[in-house]
Amino acid sequence: CQKPLTHTVYEAREITKAARYYNVQTQMGNQGHSSEHIRLLKEWLADGVLGPVTEVHAWTDRPVGGDPWSTFAVQARPQDTPPVPETLNWDLWLGPVAYRPYHPDYHPMKWRAWLDFGTGALGDMGCHILDPAFWALDLGAPDTIEATSTHWEENVAGQTFPRASIVRYRFPARGERPPVKLTWYDGRLMPPMPEELEPGRTLPDSGAIIIGKKGKIIHGSHGAGSMRLIPESRMQEYKRPEKTIPRVLGSHEGDWIRACKEGRNGTPASSSFEYGGALTEMALLGMIAIRVKNQILRWDHDALRFVNNAKADELLHIPYRPGWTL
């Protein structure tokens, strides 16, 4: 199943429970989770290369950076009703959401911008870019989330995601590991340039900075690609630890096929719904914070609710049109 796994937090929780109950082999399409780099990152952090990690900054240039839906969020809701392509079952494509007539401003691809169908830049790319820190640091569920954003364009206010946003998560301590503050930036907003980065070096268009008491790591999108300690001298000096995490042999898709062939008692795929569901929940909680904006949301993971914001609670799921249930 592609990332994000679901449209709503409730759906992510339910589909994870269903996969667990029926004991089936599953895989979410965050292919970086099968990479070598993400395993190296987890091993290096376990080795103490950064010391206790307290801060993460992650960003994407989307929805501005060259995407087919990059300029769409400023347009008005389409009013004309062109014919549905012969190759498309529009009713099935809509699934459980409220009916709207077909329009190419929704599909293909541009659906990501619309609240009806998509989850914005954070839902689109968070399961790639936040994956390394979420896994390597065993972050689990946040206890607070808050967001700020650019304004919505007048013609689509409350219908699309904003051009750019910043989301701040706080994750509680995990055993001896300290709390972590994770900040997400999209729409070409960026974190401050690390002072350890040498002159002439720049941050990637999408990626993350992981900050510990003993140093920093920068990586790109999709499974901590192009991971480097900074400054570069630290990268050259670091004595790599032994590789202890099992590697995926072949592709992300091939790993799922391998799991299916092994059957119910086999080794799960690298990003099974047990993991992918939790990662999706984290990303979609940030999406809700963007929609309520400028509110500190306190999250109760076990109860599946925000303890201090009824409006945010309503966004955990959507009404389904007749014929669809979960």
Predicted feature residues:
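Beta-strand-loop-alpha-helix segment that lines the small-molecule cofactor/substrate pocket
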Residues: 1-34, 48, 294
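Short, solvent-exposed turn/loop segments enriched in Gly/Ser/Thr/Pro and often Arg
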Residues: 5-12, 31-35, 60-62, 222-224, ...
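Active-site-proximal cap/loop segments of hydrolase catalytic domains
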Residues: 9-12, 18-20, 38, 66, ...
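Aromatic/hydrophobic pocket-lining residues that form π-stacking "cages" and hydrophobic walls in ligand
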Residues: 15, 41, 285
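Structural detector of well-ordered beta-strand residues that form the stable sheet scaffold
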Residues: 25-27, 57, 218
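Rossmann-like NAD(P)H-binding beta-loop-alpha module
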Residues: 37-93
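Glycine-rich, aromatic-lined ligand/substrate-binding cores of catalytic
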Residues: 81-82, 86-272, 280-288, 292-302, ...
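Tryptophan-rich aromatic "cage" segments
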Residues: 313-326
